[in-house]
């Protein structure tokens, strides 16, 4: 029989469980609500952007910097572990800051805990948009996380990416390793796996969570809970239209190709006919101009300036 747990042992186990849950809840904080990714409006140019030490657009320093770790704008003397001791009861502005994070480009206050823990726990350490491959230093907007594949996204690509994220890189919902129906889907690899092939020796399944992807280790989701769609690639004989009985094959494919070729030759024939008509119209126009000039040459208008006659010649005669 197992040993009976004593009071101190129960308290220690409960404390360890609470600490574990606290660490897990801290790691699952919404990225949009994190202080280093908070929304900030510049005091000088009035442009909204991600919380950062210097404005992305005008490089000006904010009057009230926000700490990237604890999110405070005022450092109190009594209730904080200040590395830099300040004389007053509290400090704000540049007197409160202690460092700039290299990952999120935001101020960190001069508290000992924030300075020692933020660089290791910064959620924007590898924050590079999966679509445009821009980091925090390459654009001024905030960083978001895809709700399906949990990759980083910038403000410009977040809606477009999430609208097309649930698309498999296959034409069926079958498992990539066998021919059975894939009950679990990895939204990073865009592939489905059956129950047997989700068991991996490399990535272990945690208690109370979905099995990890055998390729990348990301947590899979059940396909029935997602609005997954397959990618349709039409090439070769698949581009041919279906026949009356619903079948399509190479006959329809070659018929379409031949009809396209005939359509192209007909198009070129029409162009040649139009050019010939234009040339005929130009020739007809030249003939009509010559005929009209012949008619006017037979007319006698007498002595005019156009015929080389001037009025002073008549006076001399």
Curated annotation (Swiss-Prot):
- Is Hydrolase among the key words of this record? no
Note down the stretches annotated as region Disordered.
1-24, 206-299
Which InterPro entries does the record cross-reference, listed alphabetically?
Answer: NOA36 (IPR010531)
* Modified positions (Phosphoserine) in chain numbering: 288
- The lineage's top-level taxon is Eukaryota
Q: Where is the composition biased (Basic and acidic residues)?
A: 10-22, 216-225
Q: Is Transferase among this UniProt entry's keywords?
A: no
Q: Where in the cell is it found?
A: Nucleus; Nucleus, Nucleolus; Chromosome, Centromere
Q: Name one GO molecular function term.
A: zinc ion binding
Short motif Nuclear localization signal, span: 3-11
Start and end residues, zinc fingers (C4-type): 42-58, 67-104, 129-149, 175-189
Which terms are listed as keywords in the entry?
A: Centromere, Chromosome, Metal-binding, Nucleus, Phosphoprotein, Repeat, Zinc, Zinc-finger
Per UniProt, the ranges with Acidic residues bias are: 269-292
Q: Which Pfam families match?
A: NOA36
Protein family membership = Belongs to the NOA36 family.
What PANTHER family does UniProt report for this protein, alphabetically? ZINC FINGER PROTEIN 330 (PTHR13214:SF1)
| Protein name listed in UniProt | Zinc finger protein 330
Species of origin: Cricetulus griseus
> What gene does the UniProt entry assign to this protein?
ZNF330
């Amino acid at each position: 029989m197992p040993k009976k747990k004593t009071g101190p042992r129960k308290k220690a186990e409960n404390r360890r469980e609470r600490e574990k849950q606290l660490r897990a809840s801290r790691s699952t904080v919404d990225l949009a609500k994190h202080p280093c990714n908070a929304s900030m409006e510049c005091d000088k140019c009035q442009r909204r952007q991600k919380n950062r030490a210097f404005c992305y657009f005008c490089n000006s320093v904010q009057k009230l910097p926000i700490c990237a770790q604890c999110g405070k704008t005022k450092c109190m003397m009594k209730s904080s572990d200040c590395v830099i001791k300040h004389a007053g009861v509290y400090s704000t502005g540049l007197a409160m800051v202690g460092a700039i994070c290299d990952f999120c480009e935001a101020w960190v206050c001069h508290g000992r805990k924030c300075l020692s823990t933020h660089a290791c726990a910064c959620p924007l350490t590898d924050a590079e948009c999966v679509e445009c491959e821009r980091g925090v230093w390459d654009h001024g907007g905030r960083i978001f996380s895809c709700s399906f594949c949990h990759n980083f996204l910038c403000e410009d690509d977040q809606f477009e990416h999430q609208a097309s994220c649930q698309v498999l890189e296959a034409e069926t919902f079958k498992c990539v390793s066998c021919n059975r129906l894939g009950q679990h889907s990895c939204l990073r690899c865009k592939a489905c796996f059956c129950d047997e092939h989700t068991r991996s020796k490399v990535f272990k399944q945690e208690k109370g969570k979905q099995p990890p992807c055998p390729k990348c280790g990301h947590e899979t989701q059940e396909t029935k809970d997602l609005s997954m769609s397959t990618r349709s690639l039409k090439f070769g004989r698949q581009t041919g239209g279906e026949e009356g009985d619903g079948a399509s094959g190479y006959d329809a494919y070659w018929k379409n190709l031949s009809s396209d070729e005939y359509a192209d030759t007909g198009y070129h024939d029409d162009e040649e006919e139009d050019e010939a008509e234009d040339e005929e119209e130009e020739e007809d126009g030249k003939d009509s101009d010559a005929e009209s000039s012949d008619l006017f040459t037979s007319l006698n208008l007498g002595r005019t300036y156009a015929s080389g006659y001037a009025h002073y010649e008549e006076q001399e005669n």
